[in-house]
Structure formats: C-alpha cells, structure tokens
Amino acid sequence: MARQKKYSGKGGARKKNKQKQNVAPRRRVEFKYKGFTLEELQEMPIKKFMEIVPSRQRRTMARGITPKQRKLVMKIKKARRLTNRGKEARVIRTHCRDFVITPEMIGLTFGIYNGKEFKEIKLVEETVGRFLGEMAPTRAVVQHGSPGMGATRGSMFVPIK
C-alpha cells in the first residue's frame, strides 16, 4: 500500500488567494421590499403600502396619526421640498419613536430621541417598514472598569498602583 502524502495548510491558502484575485468585484444587488423596488414604493399610495408592511406596523398606521406625528409629517414634507430644490435638508429632530418609516422618508437624516440625546440616523432603503425607535436604542451595554480606590468596599484589597 502506498502511503498518502500529508499536505500542510500552506499550499491550499496560496491557491485560494490566486482564485480571489481573478474574481470580479461584486455588484450591489438592487433593493427590493416585498418584491417592490424603491421607486415603486415611493409612487405607491399609503393605503397600498400599508397592505405590504407587517401587521404590527399596519395596525399602528391604521389607527391614524397623533398631533405630534402630524407635526413630524409636516417637517418631512418641508425637508423633501428642500432636497428637491437641491438644498441640503437639516436634521429632523423628533421624539416620535412610534412612527413607521415610509418610502418618502428615505435619504433624510433624523435626530431620534433615545431618552438622553438625539441620535442622528440617515435613513436608507433597508429601514423601510420599521419604526423610528428601532434605529435609536434606549439602552446601552455598560462597560464597567476595574475597581479603584474608593470604588467599592472590596477595593480595599486591591493593591495601589
């Protein structure tokens, strides 16, 4: 019986690198939401858009809009008029976290209040049909440091640097 030759992992890696060099760069896939392109979504009436969003968002939209949300809609229309004229629209600051992102809002920058500050978020195609509040989390993961002098009762036994 002939012994099989053992290969080190180095030769395979070289082959893979050569293959990667010959591959053409990837094209960006055209965005579609539930089978509709962004242009189709922007031309679509709001009633038709309500039919294709998930039930939670559909229910929120069906209940109507509050006076605060109506004010936000007016700000969005004003910003959209400015961008159509070629001017740079300012950040739209809002406390309305329960507002559903519609196709007409894409490309605008929002300052969404998270309970402490306004997080600036530029809305892209992938955010259609979500709530504004999903883009600005209210809680952050706490990164505690090591205990120092006076930090805790147990830090008495931590040697002084």
From Swiss-Prot:
Which keywords does UniProt give here?
Ribonucleoprotein, Ribosomal protein, RNA-binding, rRNA-binding
GO terms for MF: rRNA binding; structural constituent of ribosome
InterPro entries membership: Ribosomal_uS19 (IPR002222), Ribosomal_uS19_CS (IPR020934), Ribosomal_uS19_euk/arc (IPR005713), Ribosomal_uS19_SF (IPR023575)
Pfam families, per the entry: Ribosomal_S19 (PF00203)
Q: Keyword check for DNA-binding, yes or no.
A: no
Which SUPFAM superfamilies does this UniProt record tie to the protein?
Answer: Ribosomal protein S19
UniProt-listed GO biological process terms: ribosomal small subunit assembly; translation
Ranges where the record places region Disordered:
1-26
Q: PANTHER family of this UniProt entry?
A: RIBOSOMAL PROTEIN S19P FAMILY MEMBER (PTHR11880), SMALL RIBOSOMAL SUBUNIT PROTEIN US19 (PTHR11880:SF2)
* Function per UniProt: Protein S19 forms a complex with S13 that binds strongly to the 16S ribosomal RNA.
- Record HAMAP family: Ribosomal_uS19
User: What is the protein name for this chain?
Assistant: Small ribosomal subunit protein uS19
According to its UniProt entry, this protein's organism is: Methanococcus maripaludis (strain C5 / ATCC BAA-1333)
